[in-house]
Amino acid sequence: MSKVAIFMADGCEEIEGLTVVDILRRAGVKIDMLSIGDSLNVTGAHGIQFRADYLMTDKNSDDYDGVILPGGMPGTTNLEKNTLVQSALKKQFSAGKLIAAICAAPSILGKNGVANGKKVTSYPGFEDAFPRSTYVTDSVVTDGNVITSRGMGTAIDFALAIIEYLISSDAAEDMAKNIMYK
């Protein structure tokens, strides 16, 4: 069974984080919600409070098959400023493991070089963060071990793309049917 982490920052887009967690858990993927702050309690961009599973400081990112970044503001800024997040992204990328980001969060990958040479997408207005990438406006883009997506309205497609990457396209199709999607 695959094991991934989703980095939860205060100010994250709640739907982008929690939809992914819900759908991946339904598919049997072990996904840990890691708070990048000093508390398990996280407050999203729209004031919704939820509790992460662990503090990021209590886990080793090397133990995961991939990491996921929800977008939202100021959540994306908080992720980008966090040295543990940046270190984890570099380690995951160097190891060829999954890195998935949605909405504004793919801009982090453009700025730190993870997206260099990759086909990517993001929320409109962040195109300039990808000077060394091929930017497209598809809902979800998978290029090797990097998956990017546009925003809240594409969160289910994003989660299904992660299932396809980690398990199989059949598993993603089955999940879409099971949740009455499309």
Predicted features and spans:
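Histidine-anchored nucleotide/phosphate-binding helix
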Residues: 21
